[in-house]
Regions:
Chain A
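Active-site segments of SGNH/GDSL-like serine hydrolases
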Residues: 126-129, 148-180
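Sec-dependent signal peptide recognition
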Residues: 2-9
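N-terminal signal peptide c-region/cleavage motif recognized by signal peptidases
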Residues: 14-20
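Serine-esterase "nucleophile elbow" of acetyl-processing enzymes
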Residues: 24-96, 112-119
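Short, solvent-exposed loop/turn segments at secondary-structure boundaries
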Residues: 66-71, 135-139, 171-175
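Internal alpha/beta domain cores that form substrate/cofactor-binding pockets in large enzymes
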Residues: 54-56, 90-118, 130-161
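Catalytic His-Asp segment of secreted/periplasmic serine-dependent ester chemistry enzymes
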Residues: 167-252
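Solvent-exposed loop/turn segments at secondary-structure junctions
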Residues: 61-64, 99-105, 128-134, 165-169, ...
């Protein structure tokens, strides 16, 4: 009897969690693209013990948006907003460090400084695009990733890597696949969470959510994509840190 | 550098006999077939040595189709290509067969007419490939210039930096002529050019001491891994296909053509080799499955992943080379030289494509560009991708038949008989 009640209760809980987790949006990401393979222990304890979460985003230009109020519409800002919505009662701050045109090696060298300044519980590191643009050797790229991840660990932060954008129009000129493979492999090997932006955006393109081939000078689509990335990223963080909103409320 | 897996060193059995052997064994059927296919090239028959193995044309033709399909990004049809079912892909097949045919054609020239003439022909072939590569580069530039002029999206402000090289056409074009600047998917022909440039002395050695030559090639391969050397690329980095690593496959193909295949036949026919090859192919299949089905990834033990990854295409990872060998062993076993299927009209289109590999390869690269362009312009779905893929292969086949017809017509012209046998000998190309 207790077993059945337990099962029923969990079904209700899971159902509620799913309902709460599902954003009212047109850009949902299927579960298989957000595998909860790792724990973000420092994030978990920052929220559970201190009700506070500091996140640093370190990335190149695809982590930012140009145009009027670009920063406000870029995914780091969207992430902050979504985390605040989904983790109410916590002090949440996302700081973006955009290193335009910097390779992974250059960013890795700057990471200790960023971590010392921000003292974040979570460092989101977006990398790969500039390396693909500049033709960095994938092996050197791997070494730089390792160095950067070491720096993040030394700075007492959880790490989350983000790979490049899916850009179908430049695919015949810019080969990102080898770099995506390296990131996947490094994530696997070190047990670091990887936000697979490439696969997620490709999924949106395949599903017709966004027409990523379209030529436009307007910011509407770019903002919408960043909004969706911010939300998906928040979902993955909450998932990997086991911070499901409903469970949080029950524990408090 | 990446730790090279050690337990699967190139498993090339080196037989004791080192007699230079120009001619592979031949069956009457194969001979008549090759004679038939080379009707336009009387010199091939006249030489009377081993005739062309139609399996080479067949598999090179198939490899050309697969390379075309793989070169269209976002192509649903590319799911059928072998790279999704194992470690190696069509590139390995293409390079191996190219080495095999190069040795077959130029080996005979070198044996009969000397080192200088054979070298001159090899270098002329390299020049032809160079010209073809530059032609493809021009088409690529046209596409890029079009995208640069028409495509804009703030979302891709960063990615569009790739077009910056258009701002320096002097540097870019010069680097392209030096084969240092190579657009995506245009790496195979430069590799082929370098392999041919280095081929004359290698062929000389292969004809005299084939096993020594092969061992030398393996040493260069090992050194390339150990010392991490490769040719430089522009603006950065190195060649996508490291010629010092990939030469092993080319030389191995050449070695097989010059009697190595004959010497290996007992190994290839043994049951143990077959079992090992099939087991390895199944293993590779299981591993590649975990790349496509994320949830299966956890079944790959960490120690295995640590040892195995990354599987390096640039330096022809040993796992890839072994996978190609396994594929070859199984293929040779089940598709004998005199297999009647080689005469069936169903396989004829692939064979004809394989017999004109340079033209069809270039056409394939161009069609991949064009197909991708159509798909991008129309934001086409799976249906259009399928249509583009099928139409592309039909165009490749039609062109191959046209070239065949053209060569036959030229061959009938009495004046052209004076022409020396070329790489196109026996209906195929080096």
């Amino acid at each position: 009897m207790r077993v059945i009640t337990g099962i029923l209760a969990s079904i209700v809980l899971v159902g509620a969690a799913i309902a709460a987790a599902e954003p009212q949006s047109d850009c949902d990401v299927p579960e298989w693209l957000i595998p909860a393979q790792s724990n973000l222990n420092r994030v978990t304890s920052a929220i559970k013990d201190h009700h506070r979460l500091d996140v640093s985003v370190i990335g190149s230009r695809s982590s930012a948006l140009s145009g009027p109020d670009g920063a406000r519409f870029s995914y780091p800002a969207q992430l902050e907003q979504t985390l605040r919505e989904r983790l109410p009662g916590n002090d949440i701050k996302v700081t973006a460090h955009i290193a335009s045109g910097q390779t992974t090696a250059e960013m890795a060298a700057d990471l200790p400084k960023v971590l010392a300044e921000d003292r974040p519980a979570l460092a989101i590191w977006q990398a790969g695009t500039v390396d693909a643009l500049r033709g960095v050797e994938p092996e050197d790229f791997r070494v730089s990733l390792d160095q950067g991840l070491d720096a993040i660990a030394a700075g007492n932060a959880d790490a989350l890597m983000m790979n490049m954008q899916y850009s179908p129009r430049t695919e015949s000129m810019l080969s990102v696949a080898p770099f995506a493979d390296v990131m996947h492999w490094v994530a696997e090997q070190r047990g670091v969470v990887l936000f697979d932006r490439l696969a997620i955006m490709r999924y949106w393109s395949d599903e017709g959510t966004f027409d990523l081939y379209a030529a436009t000078t307007g910011y509407a689509m770019a903002r919408h994509v960043h909004e969706c990335i911010g939300r998906a990223l928040a979902a993955q963080i909450i998932d990997a840190a086991h911070l499901d909103a409903d469970k949080m409320q029950t524990t408090r | 550098m990446v730790p090279a897996p050690t337990s699967t060193t190139p498993s090339v059995a080196v037989p004791k006999s080192a007699t230079p052997q120009l001619s592979a064994p031949q069956s009457p059927t194969a001979q008549s077939l090759a004679a038939q296919s080379s009707a336009s090239q009387p010199s091939a028959v006249h030489l009377g040595a081993a005739e062309r193995d139609l399996r080479l044309d067949l598999f090179r033709g198939l490899a050309l189709w697969l390379i075309f399909l793989d070169h269209i990004p976002e192509n649903i049809v590319s799911w059928i290509t072998i790279r999704n079912y194992g470690f190696s892909d069509a590139t390995e097949i293409f390079i191996f067969i190219s080495g095999y045919t190069a040795a077959f054609v130029y080996g005979r020239t070198m044996g009969e007419r000397g080192f200088v003439l054979a070298s001159a022909r090899i270098l002329r072939r390299a020049w032809q490939i160079y010209v073809a590569h530059i032609f493809l580069f021009t088409i690529f530039m046209a596409e890029i210039a079009y995208v640069a002029a028409t495509f804009e999206n703030p979302l891709y402000a960063e990615e569009m930096n790739i077009l910056d090289f258009l701002k320096q056409p002097d540097v870019t074009i010069f680097q392209a002529l030096l084969l240092k600047f190579k657009p995506v998917n245009m790496d195979v022909l430069p590799l082929y050019i370098v392999l041919l440039l280095l081929f004359p002395p290698m062929l000389y050695l292969l004809l005299r001491a084939p096993n020594l030559a092969l061992a030398g090639s393996a040493v260069v391969y090992a050194l390339a891994w150990k010392l991490d050397f490769n040719l430089p690329a522009y603006p950065n980095g190195v060649w996508f296909f490291n010629p010092f690593a990939w030469q092993l496959l080319f030389v191995f193909g050449a070695w097989c053509a010059l009697g190595g295949a004959h010497r290996l036949r007992h190994v290839m026919q043994s049951r143990a080799v077959l079992v090992v090859a099939i087991a390895y192919l199944l293993f590779a299949f299981a591993i590649t499955l975990t790349w496509h089905v994320e949830s299966l990834e956890r079944f790959v033990p960490t120690w295995l992943a640590d040892w195995m990854y990354p599987i390096d295409k640039t330096n022809l990872d040993v796992l890839r080379f072994a996978h190609f060998l396994a594929l070859a062993a199984v293929t040779v076993r089940f598709v004998p030289r005199d297999w009647p299927g080689l005469r069936s009209p169903i396989l004829r289109p692939a064979i004809v494509c394989g017999q004109h590999s340079l033209e069809i390869f270039c056409l394939g690269v161009f069609l991949a560009f064009a197909g991708q362009f159509i798909i991008a312009e129309t934001s086409g779905g799976p249906l259009l991708q399928t249509a583009v893929s099928v139409l592309g292969i039909i165009l490749m086949v039609a062109t191959a038949y046209l070239i065949s017809w053209y060569k036959t017509m030229e061959g009938r012209n009495p004046r052209s008989r004076v022409k020396p046998p070329d790489a196109d000998l026996a209906g195929g190309e080096a």
